Regions:
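Catalytic-core regions of glycoside hydrolase
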Residues: 33-195
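Acidic/aromatic-lined carbohydrate-recognition and catalytic surfaces
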Residues: 14, 18, 29, 34-36
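Alpha-helix N-cap and loop-to-helix initiation/capping positions
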Residues: 7-18, 53-58
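Substrate-binding cleft and catalytic face of glycoside hydrolase catalytic domains
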Residues: 1-12, 38-45
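Extracellular/luminal regions of secreted and cell-surface proteins that mediate adhesion/ECM remodeling
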Residues: 218-334
Length: 334
C-alpha cells in the first residue's frame, strides 16, 4: 500500500491530528537537531498529494495542531506554493511574517509543472490561494526560499523526448532553476535515474569546474558555499591595519543557521580574535558581501573563520586549503 495515500490513510481525520500532536511533542524535544519537518503526514508517502485530507480546512487544522509544539523554533514545509498561501495571508507575506513555514518540492524536473507544484493559470485570474503559472510560482518560491531552506527530490521526466520536457538535458537550465529556487538540499537516493544522468553529464562550466559533472557541480552548490574573493589591506595609521574582505556565497541558498565571522591573528606568543559579522546566515545565495574592520598590527598569520553560533561548529570556506580556518596572509613587520 506504499504510495497509495487514499487507501492507506486512516478513516478518521482526528487520528491524523493525534499523530501530529505526538510528532510535535518529539520535534519540540529535538528542535536543535531538526532543520525542516516536511509535510503533514497525509497523502502518498506523506508528501501532501493524493489524499482525502488536503482541503483548505484540513490543511489549516493540521497546521494549527503542529504550531502548538513547533512555534517559530522548528521549520515546517508544505508541498506546494498554493498550500503555503492557504496558510499565510497575502498581507503577512508582504510583511514577511512567516518565519516558520516554507516549501518542499518532491517533483523537481518531473514535468513542466514539477508534478503539480505549479499550475497553469496566471496569478491575476487564479487568486492568492490557487496554483499559479510556472513562471509566477518560481518567482514566488524564489522569495520564500531566500529565508527558508527549500529542497526535495529531483525526478526523471516521464517522457524525456517531448519538446517541453527537455529541461534536464540542459545543464545550464538545470543550474538556473536550482539557483532560482535557492535549493538547500535534495534526496540522495531518489530519483536515481536523473542523478545517474547528472553523473554522466558535463556541468558545462569553465575554470575550476572544467571537466566536472553536473552531479558534482550541483552537490557542491546545494545550500551555502562561501568563497573569499578579495582581500585588501590598508595602513590608515601607525600600528593599525584596515582589512576589507569580499565574500561571495556561490551556493544556491543561505546558511539558515546563526553564524559568526571572525578574524584571527596568531603567532608563537599570542593569539587575538575579533568578531567581524554576526549576520553570516543572511548571506544569500548568489550574492557578494563586503566586510571591513580595523585592528592593531601584530606579527604573525592572519585567518578568517566562520563558526555556528549555537555550538561553535566550524563552517568551512570553499577556498582551497581552507580546512577549519582560511589563511589570508602573514604580517612580518609592524
Amino acid at each position: 500500500r506504499e504510495g497509495k495515500g487514499l487507501e492507506a490513510e486512516p478513516e478518521s481525520f482526528e487520528l491524523v491530528l493525534t499523530h501530529l500532536i505526538q510528532i510535535g511533542e518529539v520535534l519540540e524535544k529535538e528542535k536543535h537537531s531538526v532543520l525542516v519537518f516536511q509535510g503533514f503526514l497525509v497523502g502518498s508517502w506523506g508528501e501532501m498529494h493524493t489524499s482525502a485530507y488536503l482541503t483548505e480546512e484540513h490543511i489549516r487544522q493540521m497546521w494549527d495542531m503542529l504550531k502548538i509544539h513547533t512555534t517559530d523554533k522548528i521549520r515546517v514545509a508544505v508541498r506546494t506554493p498554493a498550500q503555503w498561501r492557504t496558510l499565510i495571508p497575502e498581507e503577512k507575506f508582504q510583511k514577511r511574517e512567516w518565519k516558520a513555514l516554507g516549501l518542499f518540492d518532491d517533483g523537481i524536473f518531473g514535468s513542466t509543472t514539477h508534478l503539480g507544484t505549479f499550475g497553469t493559470m496566471m496569478r491575476e485570474a487564479a487568486g492568492w490561494e490557487k496554483p499559479w503559472s510556472r513562471k509566477e510560482e518560481l518567482e514566488f518560491i524564489e522569495q520564500i526560499s531566500r529565508d527558508f531552506p527549500c529542497g526535495g527530490e529531483a525526478i526523471a521526466e516521464a517522457d524525456p523526448d517531448r519538446a517541453d520536457q527537455i529541461l534536464t538535458k540542459d545543464a545550464k537550465a538545470v543550474i538556473s532553476e536550482m539557483q532560482k529556487m535557492h535549493l538547500a538540499y535534495l534526496n540522495l537516493v531518489h530519483d536515481t535515474r536523473i542523478l545517474d544522468q547528472w553523473k554522466a553529464q558535463s556541468c558545462g562550466k569553465d575554470g575550476i569546474w572544467s571537466g566536472k559533472t553536473l552531479y558534482e557541480y550541483v552537490s557542491a552548490h546545494l545550500g551555502y558555499r562561501f568563497v573569499l574573493k578579495k582581500v585588501e589591506m590598508l595602513v590608515p595609521k601607525r600600528d593599525k591595519i584596515k582589512f576589507i574582505f569580499e565574500v561571495e556565497n556561490c551556493g544556491f541558498a543561505s546558511l539558515f543557521q546563526e553564524a559568526q565571522l571572525f578574524l584571527i591573528q596568531e603567532n608563537e606568543k599570542e593569539r587575538k580574535e575579533m568578531l567581524l559579522s554576526e549576520e553570516v546566515q543572511k548571506w544569500h545565495g548568489g550574492s557578494t558581501y563586503k566586510v571591513e574592520t580595523e585592528t592593531g598590527a601584530m606579527k604573525g598569520n592572519i585567518f578568517l573563520q566562520i563558526r555556528r553560533k549555537k555550538d561553535g561548529k566550524i563552517i568551512s570556506f570553499a577556498n582551497k586549503n581552507s580546512a577549519d580556518r582560511l589563511l589570508i596572509g602573514s604580517l612580518h613587520s609592524v
